[in-house]
């Protein structure tokens, strides 16, 4: 095509297309003529609801550059869907349970007490800073997990708002435990014959659906794996 001035292979699996400057000039001229509200707008979606879930960082520390990239990318996808007539819901999935949260709380508690951070804990400077804030703002009865969770989530919200990235829904993984959604999902899987027990654990028959091996949903100690709330989350959405 005339607007492509070059094509080159860049490493295994990558092809770069170089666009002509004239193409960008032509597009900008079209935008000026059509107006920013009318250009490239369509009713393709006809109001169909679409959920775009993105960023979804663990509330165990500040967002990093990779999260920022994901935020911009996800928000761009949401804007494109909206532009094409879809009813878009932007959702942030909060990973607020599990081992990473326990390690985060243990790290914060260790710093507050003046003890070394556990080897598998979080060692960033922010843990030191937040521990100092926690000592200054709270008393000994304060739960480090709940305080740290609120601190991290507040930092996430502030960082995303500074990028003009806003969410319609902040979905807590813990909420599915409180609501019984995980138990209800597991019961539905049992009723469908999609799970079985082996070695004290509950396994998903995922090989029946093209997976290379069956996956553990509930470990032998009764603790759900990361996959179990993911299944419940998708069931909630469908």
How would you describe each model-predicted region?
Residues 1-238:
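NTP-dependent nucleotidyl-transfer catalytic core
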């Amino acid at each position: 095509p005339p607007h492509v001035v070059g094509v080159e292979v860049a490493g295994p699996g990558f092809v770069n297309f170089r666009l002509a400057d004239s193409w960008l000039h032509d597009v900008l001229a079209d935008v000026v003529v059509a107006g920013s509200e009318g250009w490239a707008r369509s009713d393709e979606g006809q109001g169909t609801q679409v959920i775009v879930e993105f960023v979804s960082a663990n509330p165990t520390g500040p967002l990093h550059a990779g999260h920022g990239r994901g935020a911009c990318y996800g928000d761009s996808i949401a804007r494109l869907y909206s532009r094409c007539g879809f009813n878009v819901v932007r959702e942030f999935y909060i990973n607020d349970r599990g081992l990473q949260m326990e390690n985060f709380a243990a790290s914060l508690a260790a710093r507050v007490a003046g003890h070394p951070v556990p080897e598998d804990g979080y060692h960033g400077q922010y843990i030191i800073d937040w521990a100092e804030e926690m000592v200054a703002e709270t008393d000994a009865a304060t739960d480090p997990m709940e305080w740290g969770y609120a601190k991290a989530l507040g930092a996430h919200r502030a960082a995303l708002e500074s990028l003009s990235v806003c969410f319609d829904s902040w979905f807590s993984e813990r909420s599915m435990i409180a609501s019984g959604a995980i138990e209800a999902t597991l019961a539905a899987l049992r009723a469908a014959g999609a799970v079985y027990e082996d070695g004290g654990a509950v396994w998903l028959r995922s090989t029946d659906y093209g997976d290379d091996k069956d996956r553990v949903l509930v470990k032998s100690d009764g603790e759900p794996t990361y996959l179990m709330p993911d299944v419940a989350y998708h069931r909630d959405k469908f």
